[in-house]
Amino acid sequence: RVGIIGNSDGHKGRPGASYPGAGWFGAVGGLTCFLMPELTRESLIKCINSRHHYATTGGPSGRMLLSVSMSFDEPATQYLDDPMIAKACSTKKCLDAIMGDIVHLPVGNSNLKVSVDAASPVRCIDIFNGLEHLECYRPYAESDLGDRIGVLWEGAEYRGRFRAVSWDGSAHFNKAKISSTSAVNFFNRDKTIDSVSSSDLAWQSVTTGNSAGFITELTDSRS
């Protein structure tokens, strides 16, 4: 019964493209995708009530098309109203459902289908059942990584203002040499990652619930 919405807490009138400047603002404004058959007020309200929507972190890679659906081996009951709120709920039989639907399946198995179309490569897809982490799907093999190493950090100190976390640090490679480095989500002009030497990196980074990091390509990485 969860429908997630992502908003842009900026002051520039650019939803999904409100980047932080200097200081401790560390994330891009979020976006919400509503799955509606038509762009009308009635369709929007029905979409929200049905939880047929999802949130992204915004930015160039945050305008993904996400489809999540389930199919059932046996007929299931779909609640058209929330049974936790409405005393009398309308229902219908179904063999499939999409994100946000409330479904009761007394017998039989269900099959989950997820499709993601994004402007950047998909690193992984985590599947949860409530708080239980069921599986992490990665659309690549270890051999596809080559000589690249990715280091990521994420999170917030707590919910609310002043939740920013400082991730200032450094990395040293004992034998391998740094060929190139790409920063991941370094949005602040005063927070950078620098090559100190052929074996060392140093960076300043801040997150406020989002993720950041770097991808380094090494030479002689297997030594």
Where are these regions (language model features)?
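C-terminal functional module detector
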Residues: 1-223
